[in-house]
Amino acid sequence: MKTTILGAGSFGTAIAFALSSNSTSVNLWGRNHTDMQSIAINRKNLKYLPTCKLPENIIVSSNIDEVLSDYSTCIILAVPTQQLRTLCLSIQDKQHIFEKTPLLICSKGIENISLKFPSEIVKEILPNNPAFILSGPSFAKEIAEDLPCTIVLAGENESLGTSIAQKISNKTFKIIYSQDILGVQIGAALKNIIAIACGIVTGKNLGNNAIATVITKGMEEIKTLYAAKNQNINLSTLIGPSCLGDLILTCTTAHSRNMSFGITIGQGADINKMLNNNSKIIEGVSTVKPLISLAKELNIELPICTSIYNLLYKNIPLEKTISDIL
């Protein structure tokens, strides 16, 4: 089996580690030539996973034509949601090379202008390729260190999805197939915003009871959006790895970028400076704007998510935000 990963950030690199154990080769592509040269020379992604050495069968490249021409079993799209459309458009004219190759999307969130989820963006631009979502509780560093995790591969084609899940799973990197591609993406999008709220509560030293309150209310908001987008709620999605599992992981440790961001806010940091100076993408920050627009369009209320939006972009005081989310 050959696999190709487009996106050499922390998660794309970690997935390369996971797939290297049962692939003859893994292509890891990134658009920045200098960064990819550094990874190739050092056999480490010094920017994101500096302590993890790449296995020899991971081939590092900044040449997208080269990696797409390698006829992979599947292509993994591992870029932030707000960059996903640009990536798909950049390979659209090469679709004849990888036509019908399954695309596994790791992006989490909602696109700013279109208010589309990642699978909807991919299906719009690359309609001939089966699209799946790969999501669940999975910190990149732990995947790269071969620590156990269980995540979900969601898509409409059950036979193909089940086959891919079996091929890319190994002893520590376990994949569960689900047909609920929408529910999985809703959980993935909202959990990052809820994690910011949990971080704020943690930064203010309000205790574990308060964190549990935010997680519980956050789960209800995931359910609210899910019901508004699809009346046939799948309970196994809500209580499975991609919703409840990912929510718990992201909301209970400072290893989560989103929770860490919230902790810093709770400790009194200047929010505008944080928004302008943060070098790493905080998915909850980039998701909350389109989410609130989508909620208005669907005529639903998401109190915690709205409170985080108002704090970040409407200058609502921190104490008022804490009161609202609790």
UniProtKB/Swiss-Prot annotation:
EC class (word):
oxidoreductase
The intrachain disulfides are none
Q: What is this protein called?
A: Glycerol-3-phosphate dehydrogenase [NAD(P)+]
Q: List positions binding NADPH.
A: 10-11, 31, 108, 140, 257, 281, 283
Q: What is the native source organism of this protein?
A: Ehrlichia chaffeensis (strain ATCC CRL-10679 / Arkansas)
- A single Pfam family it belongs to is NAD_Gly3P_dh_C
Please report which protein family the annotation says this sequence is part of.
Belongs to the NAD-dependent glycerol-3-phosphate dehydrogenase family.
Q: Which InterPro entries is this protein grouped with?
A: 6-PGluconate_DH-like_C_sf, 6PGD_dom2, G3P_DH_NAD-dep, G3P_DH_NAD-dep_C, G3P_DH_NAD-dep_N, NAD(P)-bd_dom_sf
Q: Where in the cell is it found?
A: Cytoplasm
Name the GO cellular-component terms. Answer: cytosol
